[in-house]
């Protein structure tokens, strides 16, 4: 009985059996460090105290304004890296080969390379849809147009159609939070929204629609103007009106020293 109990506690989990190379060296973080050393890389897995408890299944590697996170597959043996730059996730990859994982991490994090170049060199890397726009420094215009073309965001389209033509507002980076259209001084996350107004369709101002989808469609068919609520810092009410009026309210409440959105995050 005692022998069976000891064998039970010594038995390996399915993950450990699937990744013997990780089991051998004590987890994913150690294995990645070993691979990076093989390539004479300057990189090391981030020594974050919060990650100490998950050394086997997760790792984060940073260099300047770039970083990658690595996960592992639970049902199939796969190393799953992502590729971040200046607060934006630009690509994902999957490989069964930990040596390839070390190579792609070193190449991405230690070189001034585009996402396109990364994918051309490593066929297992798939750029995100927005990656090309960020590579070509066109992310602000791209994101404005993406919101305008997003059918799930029709409730803010009346406002976006005029805001996208405004030379001040269209130089900020737009993003949505629930039903609210927000603006940022930077193009990466976390965003810099301090003291910048945002706009919410009035029917969604309390985070719950007061109209059904059917009645919302009927509103468009009857050409009823959508009303927008403009706020700042989440709780300061600035005004309410149609799209044109909301734009005027926003511009009256923009900081005097406002500049076009920069690459990077609120932290840098």
Give the label of every model feature segment.
Residues 41-43, 207, 216, 260:
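Short glycine-aromatic motifs
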Residues 1-14, 163, 202-227, 265-268:
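Polar low-complexity intrinsically disordered regions
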Residues 2-58, 114-190:
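Negatively charged, low-complexity tracts enriched in Asp/Glu with abundant Ser/Thr
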Residues 64-104, 177-241:
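Intrinsically disordered, low-complexity regulatory segments enriched in Ser/Thr/Pro
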Residues 90-121, 223-268:
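Ampiphathic alpha-helical segments that act as solvent-exposed interaction surfaces
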Residues 56-66:
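Short, structured surface segments that line ligand/substrate-binding pockets
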């Amino acid at each position: 009985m005692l022998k069976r109990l000891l064998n039970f506690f010594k038995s390996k989990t399915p993950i450990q059996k699937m990744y013997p190379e990780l089991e051998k060296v004590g987890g994913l973080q150690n294995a990645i460090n070993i691979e990076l050393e093989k390539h004479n890389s300057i990189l090391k897995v981030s020594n974050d105290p919060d990650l100490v408890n998950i050394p086997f299944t997760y790792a984060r590697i940073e260099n300047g304004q770039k970083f990658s996170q690595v996960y592992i597959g639970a049902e199939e043996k796969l190393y799953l890296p992502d590729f971040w730059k200046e607060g934006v996730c630009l690509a994902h990859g999957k490989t069964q080969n930990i040596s390839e994982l070390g190579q792609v991490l070193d190449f991405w994090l230690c070189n001034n390379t585009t996402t396109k170049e990364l994918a051309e060199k490593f066929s297992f890397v798939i750029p995100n849809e927005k990656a090309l726009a960020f590579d070509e420094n066109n992310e602000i215009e791209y994101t404005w147009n993406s919101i305008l073309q997003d059918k799930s965001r029709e409730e803010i389209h009346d406002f976006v159609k005029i805001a996208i033509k405004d030379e001040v507002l269209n130089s900020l980076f737009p993003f949505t939070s629930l039903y609210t259209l927000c603006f940022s001084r930077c193009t990466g996350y976390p965003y810099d929204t301090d003291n910048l107004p945002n706009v919410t369709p009035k029917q969604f101002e309390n985070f719950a629609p007061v109209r059904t989808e059917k009645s919302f469609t009927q509103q468009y068919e009857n050409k009823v103007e959508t009303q927008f609520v403009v706020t700042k810092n989440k709780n300061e009410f600035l005004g309410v009106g149609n799209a044109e009026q909301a734009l005027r309210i926003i511009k009256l409440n923009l900081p005097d020293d406002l500049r076009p959105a920069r690459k990077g995050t609120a932290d840098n």
